[in-house]
Amino acid sequence: LVGFLFLAGCSAPPTVTKSDVPALLQPKLTLSIKVACVDLSGYGKRIEKKDIERFSATLKKEQIEILAVQGITRYPNVKTRVDFVNELAVQMDMRHAFGESIDISGRQEGNAVFSVYPIRSNQKKEYDVPSAFAETALHVSIDAGVMDVAIVSTRLPVKASSDELAKCMRTIAEFQKSPDAPFVVTGNLPAYKKSRDFEIFTDLQSSLPDGSAKLQTSRLWYMQGDLFKVVNARTVKTELGTLTVAEFGLYQQSRTQ
């Protein structure tokens, strides 16, 4: 009897079937969003309502859902001047956030973000480097439904050294609170190079068709992850400047069958 109990206790472990193994989580595309950016600082002409109407027509044709703009000039107290931010928001039926960089005698300069999705919050930061004058970074958190998307619209100091640019990028990276959340940076970003301060970003230029990157008025970097990837990218010419356009895929984890 003792021998029988000993053999029973040493019997082979039960066979594990495929159905007993937990299913692996696979990212599943749940939403695609189109993000674009443009820098108006080099436009050099007064922007009229008709210019904004034509620009809006292009945005609608391209189905842009989030737009980051740099180099905006506003005259809020001059009634004869068309306000770019307010007029574009009306034309596109978009929410918007504006980050003022400087105000000189009623002439405001700054950056903005427009979105068809609700804007949760916005925050502005100045750059603490010697070459900075009035340059700032505008961070906007957008509720895209399946997850929040963070967009930064910025003008970096034009005369910044390599070390100063690295410090500016660290300032921008501080906006990113969750490593898995979609994070996009737009503006006069430097030519991408491998360094500890830049390696957390991916330059959209690698996804653009050959030659089109030279047309960009505003560059786009992003933090790529398993749940946030570029689907396609291109540039689009407009009278106000060349748009950099990126379609991003937002993914969620789903179990395999």
For each of these PLM feature ranges, what is it?
Residues 72-90, 106-108, 194-200:
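Metal-dependent catalytic neighborhoods of phosphoester/phosphodiester hydrolases
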